[in-house]
A protein has these predicted regions:
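Short, Lys/Arg-rich N-terminal segment immediately upstream of the first membrane anchor
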Residues: 1-9
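Function-determining sites in protein domains
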Residues: 8-16, 21-173
């Protein structure tokens, strides 16, 4: 009877240990993903490679849009303090009119009237309605081979409910 009781306790402890270990691993991956996302939104004028915008009333692109330092700080602050909701492909806007793409930490090359960009972080912001913005994040890793090649690390889509962010994008597109 004592042996049976000890065996049951060891089995119980083993199961509890496996569950706790699994939760620790799961929590670590979630915390790591959260920290990566929050770091993506921290930027300043110094690490912006280029800002691309698509005007909302016409299908024209501006590949060298400029924001003032205080506007960049305000945008970064809005993004850092926003709550992210995971988005699906069905949440994606049907067109990109009125969107803004911010390319961070990289370089840009212009040749023969074409523009090529190499960047570590890309944030595309497209208003969905007056209170929500579809956010497409792209994180790349440089190949360090003196080319413009990058290795894709992550692409994620989110929705941010923020009328301030919608207003900011509308003012700048």
């Amino acid at each position: 009877m004592i042996i049976l009781k000890i065996f049951k306790n060891k089995v119980f402890l083993g199961i509890v240990s496996i569950i706790i270990f699994s939760l620790v691993i799961f929590s670590y991956s979630k915390i790591k993903a959260y920290n990566v996302l929050k770091d993506v939104f921290v930027f300043s004028k110094d690490n912006i490679v280029s800002i691309w915008r698509v005007k909302k009333d016409e299908d024209s692109h501006d590949y060298n849009y400029k924001l003032a330092s205080n506007e960049i700080d305000a945008l970064s602050s809005i993004l850092i303090n926003s709550k992210l909701k995971k988005a699906t492909t069905s949440d994606s806007p049907s067109n990109t009119l009125g969107s803004m793409t911010i390319l961070l930490d990289g370089k840009i090359k212009e040749e023969n009237d074409s523009v090529s960009a190499s960047f570590e972080r890309g944030i595309t912001l497209t208003p969905i309605d007056k209170d929500s913005v579809y956010v497409f994040l792209e994180i790349n890793k440089p190949t360090y081979d003196d080319s413009f090649n990058m290795d894709l690390v992550m692409q994620k889509s989110y929705i941010i409910d923020s009328s301030k962010l919608v207003e900011f994008i509308n003012e700048n597109t």
